[in-house]
Curated annotation (Swiss-Prot):
Organism the protein comes from: Xenopus laevis (African clawed frog)
Protein's name according to its UniProt entry: Serine/threonine-protein phosphatase 4 regulatory subunit 3-A
Acidic residues: compositionally biased ranges: 682-694, 798-809
Gene behind this protein: ppp4r3b-a
GO BP annotation list: DNA damage response; regulation of double-strand break repair
Biased composition (Polar residues): 750-761, 768-790
Entries under InterPro entries matching the protein: ARM-type_fold, EVH1_PP4R3, P4R3-like_central_dom, PH-like_dom_sf, PP4R3-like
């Protein structure tokens, strides 16, 4: 007994009077003890589970239909059907049923004839041949055929049944012969009916029918039928477009005829889906899912066939990179690769990985480097699209290539620099290409998609490469458009204000906005790399010049850059902003904006509100001390008054701390803290240098020491120390940067109401015990003044620098007293 002969589908009739498929299995007839009789058993072919166990009842009416169906009812509302794969299997089981019931197997119904409604019910069951009678395929029946096709679309089962009938009778080819007849006779009514018929057949969503309709023999006639939409006054000329306008170009001759046919077919079917067929309504959205799948699998097959033909791909790459290749040919080659990569998006992830690795091994990136630098706009645009596919697929692969390339090439011809230059030189007034390239650059420099392995850290290596070899190319337009060759005094604040004319050209402003967006991304994600670059180039000052631009969007980009920096709450950045007086252009922009309530106004106020809410003390102090007079009239928000309140609260807090500590301990504590702060600052710079692997400003290469922030900051600290020495008797004193410094330099004798100017008088006038002290503390006071530059931290400071020098000279003679 053959398995295929006994292979069946089991169906049951549901409450909606539709047949439900219960599974496929193999049927047998055997005696079942539990049921006390011969029974039909169907076991699933997938796992052997029991799909059906039905006793052959002597009184049940079994009906044999269409040579491969057996239908019966076991209860009032429980109808069953077995659909056999082969007629022979159906005959064998039918004989068993007839044997149990004592009937002649030649009959088609074992009991009284089944009522007509039962037969009609089973007409709804799928996978049965000839369950629908198709009208004769002739001109006079076209309207009837169109009505039939249209009527079944609302019922999935009826669609299935019609599709089977169309397939079995070769009906589609007969319809297309009628189409040619109607065209020859100019039978417009018949052509309109054929449009409805062919459109309806497409909506049957059957792959077997698509194979017929989209064959070389039939597809152009199918397109022809779809030209005659009854809703249009004149037919469309789709066939003319496909045969005359759309030209198939073989950049390299394709020797595989099957591949060529598959490419033609895919293009035409895609055209039918995208251009000819109307957009499906919400009720029809699933009707064309098989058509989409048909195109999808065609593309997969095309990519696979091309990928396997290494000779073909090698030849394409060779011609693409050959200097002798003319521009037209190169354009065709690049467009081919663009389509090739677009098709690859249909592949499964593992197959797509293999596809791009094949392209990488063949040299796609060096080839792109060549074509992206060409003058032809179409070629550059196609190359950009290909590059975007590669970056989207594997940013790491692109990064690895450019880092290897950097070891052998000049910066000017590096792939990333070529990309940056294309972004900068985009001739599109709307900078469409530049926006796309900026997005790709951001993906490449995004640490989130960089790998960290045991052997190497991609993030560190690539960012070092990018900042050393590429960042200067990216920022060149920004620095060129913000040069500071003319300076003038600001009458309001007495600060330096640039008189540079900002770029008013809209396209240039757009480009600078893109560059600023990328730099803002770097501030958020690159920490010390971008920090070094900003300091070395004094970049924030240059960016803030753009606050003067007539293009508000550019001024907002500049402000956003500063806002991101301040948002980090990094004191290193804060000191840089204070030292450079970089709030000046922001406040100028706020005042120049006047009473206008716009985005610029809100963004600037939000910046200061952030400083207030986060209580960034150094910036609060700087703003209040230097700009409050100008900001005080702004009362429609409480931000600036809030900053002043914060400032005064901090001032009071420091004063209270000062007054709560005895003067001798104050002197000890605060002097130590001041010196410890300096040590911490030096330690911070040292740690920063170690972390980055390069100095904040390389000392050997430095040509303008005055621009070096760390060195300038040391000078600033020296100035601060001198200021402290001058004002040591006055508490508190405001430093030049606007922060409050509490330094206590009183001598011990001063604390005790005596005047003393040297170490001897300190020793002579210090009482034996001071503030719970003892004579041992006396000794420590006189001995720890040994050296202001030594390893010991002095507890007492002196107002006279010369006295300090004398003590320094005398220190060797005092050192033995440490042990006494």
């Amino acid at each position: 007994m053959s398995d295929t002969r006994r292979r069946v589908k089991v169906y049951t009739l549901n409450e909606d009077r539709q047949w439900d498929d219960r599974g496929t299995g193999h049927v047998s007839s055997t005696y079942v003890e539990r049921l006390k009789g011969m029974s039909l058993l169907v076991r699933a072919e997938s796992d052997g589970s029991l799909l059906l166990e039905s006793k052959i009842n002597p009184n049940t009416a079994y009906q044999k239909q269409q040579d491969t169906l057996i239908v019966w009812s076991e209860a009032e509302n429980y109808d069953l059907a077995l659909s056999f794969q082969e007629k022979a299997g159906c005959d064998e089981i039918w004989e068993k049923i007839c044997q149990v019931q004592g009937k002649d197997p030649s009959v088609e119904v074992t009991q009284d004839p089944i009522d007509e409604s039962e037969e009609e019910r089973f007409e709804e069951m799928p996978e049965t041949s000839n369950l629908i009678d198709l009208p004769t395929c002739e001109l006079g029946k076209l309207e009837e055929i169109a009505d039939l096709v249209t009527s079944v679309l609302s019922s999935p089962i009826r669609r299935e049944k019609l599709a089977l009938a169309l397939e079995n009778e070769g009906y589609i080819k007969k319809l297309l012969q009628l189409f040619q007849t109607c065209e020859n006779l100019d039978n417009t009514e018949g052509l309109h009916h054929l449009y409805e018929i062919i459109r309806g057949i497409l909506f049957l969503n059957k792959a077997a029918l698509f194979e017929v309709m989209f064959s070389d023999e039939c597809i152009m006639d199918v397109v022809g039928c779809l030209e005659y939409d009854p809703a249009l006054a004149q037919p469309k000329r789709h066939r003319e477009f496909l045969t005359k306008t759309a030209k198939f170009k073989e950049v390299i001759p394709i020797t595989d005829s099957e591949l060529r046919q598959k490419i033609h077919q895919t293009y035409r079917v895609q055209y039918i889906q995208d251009v000819i067929l109307p957009t499906p309504s919400v009720f029809e959205e699933n009707f064309l899912s098989t058509l989409t799948s048909f195109i999808f699998f065609n593309k997969v097959e095309i990519v696979s066939m091309l990928q396997e033909d290494e000779k073909f791909l090698s030849e394409v790459f060779a011609q693409l990179t050959d200097e002798a290749t003319d521009d037209d040919k190169r354009r065709e080659l690049v467009n081919f690769f663009k389509e090739f990569c677009a098709f690859s998006q249909t592949l499964q992830p593992q197959n797509r990985d293999a596809f791009f690795k094949t392209l990488a091994n063949l040299g796609i990136l060096p080839a792109l480097e060549i074509v992206m630098g060409m003058d032809d706009l179409q070629v550059r645009a196609a190359a950009t699209d290909i590059f975007s596919y590669l970056v989207e697929f594997s940013p790491s692969m692109v990064r690895e290539f450019v880092m290897q390339e950097a070891q052998q090439s000049d910066d000017d011809i590096l792939l990333i620099n070529v990309v940056i230059e294309q972004m900068i030189c985009d001739s599109d007034p709307e900078l469409g290409g530049a926006v796309q390239l900026m997005g790709l650059l951001r993906t490449l420099i995004d640490p989130e998609n960089m790998l960290a392995t045991a052997n190497k850290t991609e993030k560190s290596e690539f960012l070092n490469f990018f900042y050393n070899h590429c960042m200067h190319v990216l920022t060149a337009p920004l620095l060129a458009n913000t040069s500071e060759d003319k300076l003038e005094k600001d009458a309001v604040f007495g600060s330096i204000k640039t008189s540079t004319v900002c770029p008013d050209n809209y396209q240039t402003a757009q480009l600078l906005a893109l560059i600023l967006e990328l730099l803002t991304f770097c501030v958020e994600h690159h920490t010390y790399h971008i920090k070094n670059y900003i300091m070395n180039k004094d970049l924030l000052r240059r960016v803030l010049i753009l606050m003067n631009s007539k293009h508000t969007f550019l001024a907002l980009c500049a402000l956003r850059f500063m806002r991101r920096i301040i948002g980090l709450k990094d004191e290193f950045y804060n000191r840089y902003i204070i030292k450079g007086n970089l709030f000046d252009p922001v406040i100028n922009a706020l005042l120049d904006n006047g009473t206008r309530y716009n985005l610029l106004n809100s963004a600037i106020i939000e910046l200061f509100e952030f400083i207030r809410v986060e209580d960034i003390k150094s910036l609060t102090s700087h703003i209040v001390e230097n700009f409050y007079k100008a900001l005080e009239p702004i009362e429609y928000v409480q931000t600036f008054k809030g900053l002043k309140t914060r400032y005064e609260q901090e001032k009071d807090r420091q004063s209270q701390k000062l007054s709560s500590v005895p003067s001798i301990l104050r002197s000890n504590r605060f002097r130590r803290d001041a010196r410890a702060l300096e040590d911490d600052e030096e330690l911070w710079f040292n740690e920063d240098d170690e972390e980055e692997g390069e100095a904040v400003v390389p000392p050997v290469e430095k040509t303008k020491p005055e621009d070096d922030f760390p060195e300038g900051y040391e000078k600033f600290l020296e100035t601060k120390k001198a200021k402290e020495l001058e004002d040591k008797e006055n508490l508190p004193k405001r430093t030049s940067v606007g922060a409050f410094k509490f330094t206590f330099s009183h001598s011990v004798s001063a604390a005790n109401g005596a005047n003393s100017t040297n170490s001897k008088s300190v020793a002579a006038h210090t009482p034996p015990a001071t503030s719970n002290g003892s004579s041992s503390k006396n000794t420590s006071l006189t001995t720890t003044v040994a050296s202001t530059k030594g390893s010991l931290i002095g507890l007492v400071d002196y107002p006279d620098d010369e006295d300090e020098e004398e003590e320094e000279d005398a220190s060797p003679r005092k050192r033995p007293r440490l042990g006494s």
